[in-house]
């Protein structure tokens, strides 16, 4: 493995608030959002694009993986319909270049990998169908998933 730089930005200056995490030479970044800070996320334009997201129950080591065209709207729905989680992580493109089919493909890869590695109890009942993406994109999306594993500390979608 080669050296990588991870940068974390604290928009409100607090470790208990939202964190924006970027990885050198990566086309994705992560928004780490405590459930109690959801409304503060409304100010961030980047989360209004297609995203892969993780809902996490820190106490019980549980994980739900999903995809959305607009993370903020989706997570607000989950705020009312899913009680188990206390932390959300949204993975978005730095260039707003991910399409719905790309995100669905990433979701399928992420659920499959998370279920295999058993880093956390995965609450997804099934592995989403692997969406058809252009063969030129497959390598890029698999590389993104490797970056996502690093951005999430390797514990959510762990290395095999």
Task: Name what the model sees in each region.
Residues 1-50, 58, 71-160:
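Boundary/linker segments flanking structured domains
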